[in-house]
């Protein structure tokens, strides 16, 4: 009886953080590489493929942070991003295909290499080099914003 009454006197506090946002992003003009010498011009790419929404989105629910990208986002980029998190209780999930599609986003070191001109790192990198670093930095900024709140 005493244990039950003592238990009821313990203060309980629940706190749930809930936040979401959509952030428009800027990218260079898109193109499609057929090979290292033949690249479809941006205006023709636009005519053939059309335009797509370009934004990052995030949802914060408690200690879970879900970041959506408009790409096929390389898992190789996730580990360095996770290591940048100072709040170790924050659980990060990065998702691809958040409503738009801009092609593959891979580590910049793989872009335009002659020895590995693969589908993912060459043909499907529609917006050119440096997007691996660019997206990683944007996601780190989203993490910083959410670590403060």
Model-derived features: where do they sit?
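Non-catalytic substrate/cofactor recognition surfaces at enzyme active-site rims
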Residues: 1-149
């Amino acid at each position: 009886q005493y244990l039950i009454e003592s238990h009821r006197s313990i203060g309980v506090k629940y706190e749930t953080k809930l936040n979401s946002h959509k952030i428009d992003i800027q990218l260079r003009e898109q193109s499609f590489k057929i090979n290292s010498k033949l690249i479809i011009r941006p205006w023709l790419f636009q005519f053939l493929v059309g335009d797509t929404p370009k934004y990052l989105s995030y949802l914060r629910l408690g200690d879970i942070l879900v970041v959506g990208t408009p790409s096929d986002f390389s898992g190789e980029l996730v580990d360095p991003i996770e290591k940048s998190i100072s709040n170790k209780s924050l659980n990060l999930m990065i998702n691809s295909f958040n409503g738009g599609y801009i092609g593959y986003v891979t580590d910049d070191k793989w872009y335009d290499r002659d020895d590995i001109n693969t589908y993912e790192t060459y043909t499907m990198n529609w917006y050119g080099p440096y997007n691996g670093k660019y997206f990683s930095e944007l996601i780190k900024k989203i993490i910083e914003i959410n670590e403060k709140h």
